[in-house]
Amino acid sequence: DDDCGWIMDDCTSDSDCCPNWVCSKTGFVKNICKYEM
């Protein structure tokens, strides 16, 4: 499914992002997808 959020995509929750990616809740990158190491 290519319709998921990659880095710097807006999100409101982790479900808006790709698998293994999370929606940042804090800081400069608040509410964007980031890779969860």
UniProtKB/Swiss-Prot annotation:
Compartments (UniProt record): Secreted
GO function terms (MF aspect): calcium channel regulator activity; ion channel inhibitor activity; toxin activity
InterPro entries (alphabetical): Huwentoxin-1
Pfam families: Toxin_12 (PF07740)
Keywords for this protein: Calcium channel impairing toxin, Disulfide bond, Ion channel impairing toxin, Knottin, Neurotoxin, Secreted, Toxin, Voltage-gated calcium channel impairing toxin
Disulfide bonds: 4-18, 11-23, 17-33
Domain of life: Eukaryota
Tissue expression notes: Expressed by the venom gland.
This protein's GO CC annotations: extracellular region
Record's comment describing the protein's domains: The presence of a 'disulfide through disulfide knot' structurally defines this protein as a knottin.
Its job: Blocks calcium channels (Cav).
Protein name: Omega-sparatoxin-Hv1a
Species this chain originates from: Heteropoda venatoria (Brown huntsman spider)
